């Protein structure tokens, strides 16, 4: 029985990390669809959405199987519960990537509003947070998870800067209202990706240390 349990646990972790890699790729492709005006990348994100959704259902089923079949000790129970929450955040990251890809398809039809400066910085930071949060899951690294948490405010600051600048452009030139608004939506979706990466980092802390830190910061779920 113990051998079967370890196998089931390893497979659950493997599927979660595969889902994480798909979500990372979707975010990377979506933001580069915007920055490079690449509709092909945007379509690739939309085409792969179902794979992430299917994995969410599969992982949920595996979690329920483990909870129903085994009497889990505290550390294993925390791991399984954390996986369930991380699973949901990864699916939502996939949704944010789809939103960005759809914005990219609309933005490409218009002249560029301005040179991209803060948006690449914001996307790079959000991607780093996501990558480090998933690495923290693999390594069970509480310190790396805490490092992700402190970067959330940086993403929020970049979002605010982008909002202010684009709103100024919109007020000065009505011709850029539509693409500028889409870029605001892209920034908002990147901010949400940072929030979900932060949620994953919080779940790592819970999984490893047993400390639930979700309510020590504003709710992002």
Describe the residue ranges of each PLM region.
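Cytosolic, long alpha-helical scaffolding segments
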Residues: 1-221
